Amino acid sequence: MARRHTRGLWITSAGLPQTGHAGRVTQPSLASSGHRVLGGPSWRPGQPLDKRGLARLAAEQFDLLTHAQCRAAGLGWKVIDHRVRSGRWTRAYPGIYLTRPGRDDPLTTMTAALLAVGEPSALSHESAAYLHGLRRMPPQPHLLVPAGRAPAPPGVVVHRTRHLEARVDELAWPWRTGVEHTVLDCADLASMTLDEAVDLVARACAQRLTTPAQLGAALAGRARHRLRADLVDVLTDVGAGAES
């Protein structure tokens, strides 16, 4: 099966990514006040930022910059506007600039949505499943945000939770939910059948991204999961098969 490397992911000819050694960025950073996230851009608000640092930040963010980041590096409103008007940059979302126009690969598309929604947030559901190599890329980015957050930009599907921090993979960039919660989030979607959910569980375990025990532990905290009873049985069967 043919595959190509795209900034930390191996994209197969079937359209599913395979994680590579560069799939995690481990520079220390803070997702928000009180939310510790280890992966992500090396620059954080409040830190000094020069033009060279801005270029490095764009590279870390798949050629994307936020308006706040540009301003922190000393770019004035007129400079930013000129770069957009001249076609040197394009707007991915309001306040989000693509510094290499025409780039539309999955990582850029999803990171643009993540930056547009703002912190704290993480790619979730089918978007996170794509990044974990479990599903095809969905037509719209899915993000998990804290309960009570404002509406998302057009074209972005937002899911709200009171447990965001506990469900985010602390090492991955772009920020995303961990494998166990990604599988359970997808299985909780009304559009996913039980057979599809079982296949997703089996695939995650077969790829050794997680185990039935780890999935069961995550499921234990989801009393209202629509497939809870079915998944308990499935995880028991999968676990028994793995031990035999």
Language-model segments: what does each one mean?
Residues A2-L231, D237:
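Short gly/ser-rich loop at a beta-strand->alpha-helix junction or flexible surface loop bordering the NTP-binding
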Residues V238-S244:
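Acidic-basic catalytic patches of nuclease active cores, encompassing PD-(D/E)XK
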